[in-house]
Amino acid sequence: MAVPCPYPIEALLPHARPMILIDRVLDFDPKFIEAELTVRPEMPFFEPDKGVAAHVSLEWMAQACAAYVGLEALLANQTVRIGFLLGTRNFAAKIPWFAAGETLRVRADLVFRDGETGVFDCAIYRDALETVRAQLTLHQPMDIHAVLASQGIELKQ
């Protein structure tokens, strides 16, 4: 059964504004999450007279997936962790741009999960019209410091 989200989006994502691109979680259960955003001129990637290009919706979908695992973490009294978008399959956009003022719904359905890796079928809706669809593969390591250290990168806290 889906329930309203008890947390603001800032609590669910390991991001900071202005890179938090979705506004809120509308609905979730163990199999899916639905988020919402309104396209605004002050958003990153907004182009005057055009809006936001459809390919930016990949980040909206990735953030919805991140909100899903962030919400899971908080409900289990765990820390929200950083994750990575590993790949995108079957990206299809029916429109090239999203205009200022449009309110969009982002849905991510869990397809597969095995430890630190998950696959989600995602879609962006304007009203009832599906405008973009893609399948995202994501990875959320248990120890981000070890992963980065293996690449010679130190994460500052």
Regions found by a protein language model. Name each.
Residues 17-53:
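Catalytic strand-loop segment that frames the active site of acyl-thioester-processing enzymes
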Residues 6-16:
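Short aromatic-glycine motifs in intrinsically disordered, low-complexity regions
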Residues 49-68, 82-86:
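Compact, glycine-rich, soluble single-domain proteins
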Residues 23-26, 94, 109-111, 125:
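Conserved positions in beta-strands of structured domains
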Residues 20-23, 86, 106-108, 134:
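Small-residue-enriched segments and motifs
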Residues 68-105:
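Hydrophobic beta-strand-centered segment that forms part of the acyl-chain substrate-binding groove
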